[in-house]
């Protein structure tokens, strides 16, 4: 049995390639492979492309804010630490629990999605059986060591990146007739994109699905979580942010274009990945089986990143003395075992969603995760706004910041407003409205819990300035 150490620091073992692939691995998973079908069926092809373009803009704005903060203050559990310092300790506490909720709920939806993938080959085996199997695998990967986790995630993510590139190339060839359709029908060209009109249900569905789009992009902010375990963060983090954003925009927009062009909006949902539907339409032998396996790998990789993130958030809360000290204990390999074990309980959500109408519960779980991650993004933009303002008020030069978000204050303000608009969009979608009914009370509960449990003399977080 591994020994545990009280309040021991986490180890800085991640390199640039680990950080880039960790972020990509967290993003390329359940949201892209399954929720894209829901968005196409709701908004139409052109509406989906527009929604993802807006989502890409939001990600760019948030990551610029996070880049400046995490280079100035590279810490594990970055978001809630920044929020505590610049927005108030109660807000920091709430942000931490929101982000923990984001990834534990995402764990449940990821395991459910993985179960759907396995049912493609084994339709007689219940989804919950696969949930149990994958829970054990993901937990095992996380408890060995941080370096082992990072190496595993690097190769998982590399498989996904190569596959997405291949999908865009093959799908593009099928769109324009270079690869024949399996049923002998002519190449669709751009007909599916324009068949129902540019916006068949108007503009409101785009607003309604923005949280689902943001859920698909969630994971980019893992760069901030891993900053405290990264070698030379001042050099590594800016490179990772620039590289990750560029690749995500290319991968997501290219992938959504191929999906929207090849699948009519009436044929997509969440029971089967639209990616598998595409390769069933294209006459490539065994391509659907191969890609189903890749999707399975991608989803488990995203779950792997999610357990890492949620475990580190509990460790950080304990390290800041807002959770019992047991959560800050780490093994001799620097792994917060107790924090990981508690976070793994999110896998129970997968069992629930696989039993109770996975068609609707899965969408609701994604919406709750989407609400939570957008709320965290709100805090990142607000924290950056206050951080830069105080930096200037203290008479410090901008040149002292080794990574600077451009166009201040436009970037944090616009990022905050767009995230807020996405949350408002939930109120207009009955299928996702549950995110507000669950998310807002959860926020109130966190604030109440903070003021009830934290000593009065600990409620003022000392301000830290960037060195």
Swiss-Prot record:
Highest taxon above the source species: Bacteria
Pfam entry (one): AA_permease
Keywords in alphabetical order: Cell inner membrane, Cell membrane, Membrane, Transmembrane, Transmembrane helix, Transport
Predominant localisation class: membrane
Membrane topology: Multi-pass membrane protein
GO molecular function: amino acid transmembrane transporter activity; S-methylmethionine transmembrane transporter activity
Gene3D superfamilies for the chain: Amino acid/polyamine transporter I
InterPro entries: AA-permease/SLC12A_dom, Amino_acid_permease_CS
Spans traversing the lipid bilayer: 20-40, 43-63, 96-116, 125-145, 161-181, 206-226, 245-265, 282-302, 337-357, 361-381, 408-428, 434-454
GO cellular component, one term: membrane
UniProt subcellular location: Cell inner membrane
Role played: Transporter for the intake of S-methylmethionine.
Family membership: Belongs to the amino acid-polyamine-organocation (APC) superfamily. Amino acid transporter (AAT) (TC 2.A.3.1) family.
Name recorded for this polypeptide: Probable S-methylmethionine permease
Origin species: Escherichia coli (strain K12)
């Amino acid at each position: 049995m591994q020994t545990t150490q009280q309040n021991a620091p986490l180890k800085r073992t991640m390199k640039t390639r680990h950080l880039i692939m960790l972020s990509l691995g967290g993003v390329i998973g359940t949201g892209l492979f399954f929720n894209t079908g829901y968005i196409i069926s709701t908004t139409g092809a052109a509406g989906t492309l527009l929604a993802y373009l807006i989502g890409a803009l939001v990600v760019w704005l948030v990551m610029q804010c996070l880049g400046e903060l995490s280079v100035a203050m590279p810490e594990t559990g970055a978001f809630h630490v920044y929020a505590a310092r610049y927005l108030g300790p109660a807000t920091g506490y709430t942000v931490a629990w929101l982000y923990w909720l984001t990834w534990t709920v995402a764990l449940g939806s990821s395991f459910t999605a993985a179960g759907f993938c396995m049912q493609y080959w084994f339709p007689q085996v219940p989804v919950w059986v696969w949930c149990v199997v994958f829970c054990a695998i993901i937990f095992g990967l996380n408890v060995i060591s941080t370096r082992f986790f990072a190496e595993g995630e690097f190769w998982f993510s590399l498989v996904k990146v190569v596959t997405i590139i291949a999908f865009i190339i093959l799908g593009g060839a099928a769109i324009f007739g270079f690869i024949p359709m399996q049923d002998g029908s002519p190449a669709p060209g751009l007909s599916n994109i324009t068949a129902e009109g540019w916006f068949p249900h108007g503009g409101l569905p785009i607003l309604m699905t923005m949280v689902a789009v943001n859920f698909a992009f969630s994971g980019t902010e893992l760069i901030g979580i891993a900053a405290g375990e990264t070698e030379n963060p001042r050099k590594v983090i800016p490179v990772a942010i620039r590289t990750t954003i560029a690749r995500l925009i290319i991968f997501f927009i290219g992938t959504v274009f191929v999906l929207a062009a090849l699948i009519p909006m009436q044929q997509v949902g969440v029971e089967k990945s639209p990616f598998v539907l595409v390769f069933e339409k294209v006459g490539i032998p065994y391509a659907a089986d191969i890609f189903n396996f890749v999707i399975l790998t991608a989803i488990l990789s995203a779950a792997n990143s999610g357990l890492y993130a949620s475990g580190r958030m509990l460790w950080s809360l304990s390290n800041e003395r807002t959770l019992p000290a047991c959560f800050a204990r780490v093994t001799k390999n620097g792994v917060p075992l107790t924090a990981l074990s508690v976070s793994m309980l999110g896998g129970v959500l997968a069992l629930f969603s696989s039993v109770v109408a996975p068609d609707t519960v899965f969408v609701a779980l994604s919406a709750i995760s989407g609400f939570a991650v957008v709320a965290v993004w709100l805090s990142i933009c607000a924290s950056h706004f206050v951080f830069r303002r105080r930096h200037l008020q203290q008479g410090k030069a901008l040149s002292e910041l080794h990574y600077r978000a451009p166009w201040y204050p436009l970037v944090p303000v616009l990022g905050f407003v767009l995230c807020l608009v996405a949350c408002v969009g939930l109120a207009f979608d009955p299928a996702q409205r549950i995110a507000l009914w669950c998310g807002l009370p959860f926020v109130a509960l966190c604030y109440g819990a903070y003021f009830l449990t934290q000593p009065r003399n600990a409620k003022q977080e000392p301000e830290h300035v960037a060195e």
